[in-house]
């Protein structure tokens, strides 16, 4: 068996734990015909003691080059992106270029690229910039959708050998364009690096195409959030790398970037503003080699499994049934790693592309909320972090007879 090696620095990995019967994917849902061959997988969670990165020792999901977004157009997300763009422009205003070219790496259908419209750098007209923005996305269907919306979106993936030749940035307010004729002034990337089996190559691409002193605004999910909340069901194969601020800093500095600013946004996401520097001048941050304690995460897994088992025993004694609302990655993991998979009647989810298919590993049918009228249940467990109260309101408004509404709070199922 080949020795386990870190996907960031190539050093040896140490296994922390194995999570059993995990979904192979958070985005690919089997059809009825595929159930006979589709199954869960065991995921080995490891840590590199050299750079500190916690990662799964597995192949990346087949679609790791594609950006798949849900909820990208919410008012909360729009306000956050606009705030980040304004901050980036405030730093670019210190440079000489008044028409900066800004590239998004991994753009999806342009949900976030479109949010540049109306963003201004400063009320002082002498400092105001005209940002020319463009994006690259691997999945053709998403590129075509973004182009149809009038965005400067191109098919591609940020890796060695990919060229930006022939591309143009677009000033969204005026519709004016500017060709990419040299190096870029800035780049942005939102929650994409954690999917990459070779993050160093992606960052090397960014470094090669930025001007010296150019900026890179980067976000990734925070592994510290999972540790703090002891939430094992937040782990998923799609996120092959689980970055802390320290392990991310180690990686970006190795690629020639200096950290300008960092913060945690939305409680669960790391945001770095980086600057391209001479590699010889970069601070050499190194991990102290401390082993991450995931004991609390494993305790959380056992406690949730026990509470769910106890709850379902009570349900069976009353001759009642349960459904789950939310085919989120958290919901998929809970279903495949607990007794829920044996008792839940079906999963309700509002995403049309999931409906009519089945949950990976647990093989439960995914349906629209209207299915409740054909097959009513006595209670519904909501597993959709961030949307629990909204969904509870929909259940109480639309479903009759109204079932009991439950949610997972910490390590226990509670009625709302």
Where are the regions a protein language model picked out?
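Hydrophobic, well-ordered beta-alpha structural blocks that scaffold small-molecule cofactor pockets
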Residues: 88, 273-416
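Conserved SAM-binding loop
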Residues: 88-230, 242-257, 274-276, 332-333, ...
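Acceptor-substrate binding/catalytic loop of class I
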Residues: 32-37, 231-246
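General small-molecule cofactor/ligand-binding pocket signal
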Residues: 14, 154, 260, 367, ...
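Fe-S ferredoxin-like electron-transfer domains
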Residues: 44, 52-118
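N-terminal juxtadomain amphipathic helix
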Residues: 1-77, 263
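Terminal amphipathic helices with adjacent charged low-complexity linkers/tails
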Residues: 261-269, 278
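Short hydrophobic/aromatic beta-strand or adjacent loop that forms the aromatic wall/cage
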Residues: 42-45, 268-272
């Amino acid at each position: 068996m080949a020795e386990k090696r870190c996907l960031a620095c190539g050093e040896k990995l140490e296994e922390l734990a194995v999570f059993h019967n995990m979904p192979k994917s958070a985005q690919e849902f089997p059809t009825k015909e595929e159930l006979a061959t589709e199954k869960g997988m065991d995921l080995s969670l490891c840590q590199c003691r050299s750079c500190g990165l916690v990662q799964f020792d597995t192949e990346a999901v087949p679609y790791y080059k594609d950006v798949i977004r849900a909820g990208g157009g919410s008012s909360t997300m729009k306000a956050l992106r606009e705030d980040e763009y304004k901050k980036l422009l405030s730093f670019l205003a210190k440079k000489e270029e008044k028409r900066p070219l800004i590239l998004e790496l991994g753009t999806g259908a342009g949900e976030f690229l479109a949010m540049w419209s109306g963003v201004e750098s400063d009320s002082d007209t002498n400092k105001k910039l005209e940002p020319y923005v463009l994006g690259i996305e691997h999945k053709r269907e998403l590129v075509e959708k973004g182009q149809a919306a009038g965005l400067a979106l191109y098919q591609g993936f940020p890796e060695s050998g990919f060229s930006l030749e022939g591309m143009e940035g677009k000033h969204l307010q005026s519709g004016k364009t500017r060709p990419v004729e040299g190096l870029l002034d800035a780049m942005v990337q939102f929650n994409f690096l954690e999917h990459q089996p070779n993050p160093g190559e992606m960052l090397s691409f960014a470094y090669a195409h930025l001007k010296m002193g150019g900026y890179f605004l980067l976000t990734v999910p925070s592994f510290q959030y999972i540790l703090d909340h002891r939430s094992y069901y937040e782990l998923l194969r799609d996120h092959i790398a689980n970055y802390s601020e320290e392990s991310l800093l180690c990686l970006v500095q190795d690629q020639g970037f200096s950290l300008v600013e960092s913060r945690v946004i939305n409680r669960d996401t790391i945001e770095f503003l980086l600057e391209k520097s001479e590699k010889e001048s970069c601070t050499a941050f190194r991990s102290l080699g401390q082993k991450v304690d995931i004991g609390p995460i494993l305790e959380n897994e056992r406690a949730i499994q026990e509470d769910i088992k106890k709850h379902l025993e009570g349900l069976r004694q009353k001759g009642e049934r349960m459904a789950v609302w939310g085919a989120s990655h958290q919901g998929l993991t809970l279903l495949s790693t607990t007794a829920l998979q044996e008792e839940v009647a079906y999963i309700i989810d509002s995403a049309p592309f999931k409906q009519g298919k089945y949950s990976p590993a647990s093989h439960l049918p995914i349906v629209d909320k209207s299915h409740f009228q054909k097959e009513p249940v006595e209670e519904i467990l909501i597993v959709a972090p961030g949307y629990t109260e909204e969904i509870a309101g929909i259940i109480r408004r639309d479903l009759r007879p109204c079932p009991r509404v439950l949610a997972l709070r910490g390590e226990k199922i509670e009625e709302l």
